[in-house]
Amino acid sequence: MSLIDWFAARRKDQFVGKVSQDTEESDGLWVKCSECGQVAYRKDLISNFNVCSNCSHHNRINSDERINIIADKDSFKEFDDSLSPTDPLKFKDRRSYSDRIKESQEGTGLKDGVITGICSINSMPLALAVMDFRFMGGSMGSVVGEKITRIIEKATIENYPIVIVCASGGARMQEGMLSLMQMAKISGALKKHRAKNLLYMPLLTHPTTGGVTASFAMLGDLILAEPKALIGFAGRRVIEQTLREKLPDNFQTAEYLLEHGFVDVIVNRKELKSTLTSILKIHGVKDLMGAN
C-alpha cells in the first residue's frame, strides 16, 4: 500500500460510523454493512430503504420508517397513541420494570413497542400495526396486545384488511401472565376478522420470536417475511440442547421456513408496497374512491 492509499484509508475510517446491524446506532457519514463489510454513504443507504446495495442485507429500521414505506404519504392516522404501560407486578430484576419503561420511552420517543392506525396504500384502505424492536426488544406486553387487538377490531368493523409488521423477542416477562394472555386475546380478535372473510397479512421481520411467533405472526392468510429474517419460537441453542443434535446453518431463517411451508413469500423491502398492493387487488380490495 502506498503512502497516499494509507492516508486515504485512514481518512475514510474517520467517517465510518460504528459497525452495527442496526444503522440507527451509527452516527457517522458512512455505514459499514454488518453482513458483507461494504461501506456505504449513510444517505444512500437510507434512500435504498436501509438495504445494502452490495449484498441486499436488510438492516433493521424503526416503526416510522416502516410506515413511510407502506403507507401513502400523509395518509397514516395513528390510534391509541396515549396508551402507556404500567408496572402492576412491581417487577424488579437488576433494575425495576418502571425504570426500563422510562428508559425505552425516552430513548425511542414511543409509549410502547407498537404503533397502530389506519392508512391508505396506493389509495386502498389498510389497517396497520408496526412493532418496534427498539422498545424493550419489541416485547409484547399488555399495551402492545391491547393496541393490536383494538386495531384488529377496528378493521373488522370497517371491513378493512390488516397488515401487522412483526419484530419481537416475544412476550414481556416483566408482566407475567398479563403478557401471555395477549396471545389469546389477539388471536381471538383475528378469528372474528377472518369470520368476515377479511384479509390479514403478517410481515415477519428480523427478529420475530417467542410468543409473537406462537400467536398472531403465524395466523395470516398470507405470511410474508423479509429476506434472512430470524423467525422462531425458542432460541437455537435451547433447541440444540433439547434435541441433542446440530441444526442446519440456515435454521430459523425466512428462507428455511419458506422451504418448509411456514412462510408463503419472501419480499424484498424495496418491493413490499407493490407486493402488498397486488395482493390486495387480487383479493378484491377497492380503493377509497370505490374503484377496483
UniProtKB/Swiss-Prot annotation:
Q: What does this protein's record comment on cofactor binding?
A: Binds 1 zinc ion per subunit.
Report the locations given in the UniProt record: Cytoplasm
What InterPro entries does the record point to?
AcCoA_carboxyl_beta, Acetyl_CoA_COase_Trfase_b_su, ClpP/crotonase-like_dom_sf, COA_CT_N, Znf-ACC
Superkingdom assignment: Bacteria
* Recorded GO CC terms: acetyl-CoA carboxylase complex
Q: Tell me, what is an example of a GO biological process annotation in this record?
A: fatty acid biosynthetic process
Q: What keywords is this UniProt entry annotated with?
A: ATP-binding, Cytoplasm, Fatty acid biosynthesis, Fatty acid metabolism, Lipid biosynthesis, Lipid metabolism, Metal-binding, Nucleotide-binding, Transferase, Zinc, Zinc-finger
Q: Name one GO molecular function term.
A: zinc ion binding
Chain positions of all zinc fingers (C4-type): 33-55
* Record-listed E.C. numbers: 2.1.3.15
Q: Which residues bind Zn(2+)?
A: 33, 36, 52, 55
Biochemical pathway: Lipid metabolism; malonyl-CoA biosynthesis; malonyl-CoA from acetyl-CoA: step 1/1
> Pfam families recorded for this chain?
Carboxyl_trans (PF01039), Zn_ribbon_ACC (PF17848)
Query: What reaction gets catalysed by this protein?
Result: N(6)-carboxybiotinyl-L-lysyl-[protein] + acetyl-CoA = N(6)-biotinyl-L-lysyl-[protein] + malonyl-CoA
CoA carboxyltransferase N-terminal domain segment(s): 29-292
Main location (coarse class): cytoplasm
Which cofactor names does the annotation list?
Zn(2+)
Protein function = Component of the acetyl coenzyme A carboxylase (ACC) complex. Biotin carboxylase (BC) catalyzes the carboxylation of biotin on its carrier protein (BCCP) and then the CO(2) group is transferred by the transcarboxylase to acetyl-CoA to form malonyl-CoA.
What's the family? Belongs to the AccD/PCCB family.
Under the subunit heading, UniProt states: Acetyl-CoA carboxylase is a heterohexamer composed of biotin carboxyl carrier protein (AccB), biotin carboxylase (AccC) and two subunits each of ACCase subunit alpha (AccA) and ACCase subunit beta (AccD).
Q: Which PANTHER family match?
A: ACETYL-COENZYME A CARBOXYLASE CARBOXYL TRANSFERASE SUBUNIT BETA, CHLOROPLASTIC
Entry protein name: Acetyl-coenzyme A carboxylase carboxyl transferase subunit beta
What species was this sequence derived from? Prochlorococcus marinus (strain MIT 9515)
Organism lineage reads as: Bacteria, Bacillati, Cyanobacteriota, Cyanophyceae, Synechococcales
Task: Name the gene.
Answer: accD
